[in-house]
Amino acid sequence: MSITRLLVLPLAAFAISAAVLTPAQARQQDPAGSQAQRDAMARLAFMDGEWRGTAVINSPEGRTTLTQTERVGTHLGGSIRVVEGRGYAADGATRFNAFAIIGWDERTQAYTFHTYAQGYQGDYPFEATEDGFRWRTPAGPGATIQYVATIKDGRWHEVGHYVREGQPPLPYIEMDLRRVGDSDWPGAGAVSPE
């Protein structure tokens, strides 16, 4: 038997078995995700809705105040939560726009947090707390920005500190938002099959 035939036969058998197994596996998957994912998202339901208030950002260039909005809702049958934040200048121009997806990884038993903002994207540690959440993002060598949010009684208060090893935390951003209503985003408006 030639070496080519020895290599081709197992590869062909693998390809056939993969083609046969894939439709069966696909039928077993729940398009709404798992119950564990939905349960993890339910613990964050306090985030849902439309929010508006202020964001104060401290930078080397000075202090900037924006009108900040957030809209939050679930998708994929409640198995993920999506967040869009926008910061508006006094003239109404969008100065900041971010989008995030919060999920639950059953293998690690931890939340996942993937964000897009200002031309960057990344996966960052995210932890639900009793009355909010916390997360952090790298901010250069030996530094992070650590965010802590408290959401209760219709108020979303989030503070971010720039933390460099061996130095005291510096205030970077503070958001103070009020819940202004419910939102059917992003689930509403799906394209119908006909």
Place the predicted regions along the sequence by residue:
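N-terminal signal peptide c-region/cleavage motif recognized by signal peptidases
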Residues: 21-23
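Hydrophobic small-molecule pocket/channel-lining residues, especially in calycin-type beta-barrels
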Residues: 25-194
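Positively charged n-region of N-terminal signal peptides that target proteins for export
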Residues: 1-5
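Bacterial N-terminal signal peptides
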Residues: 8-19
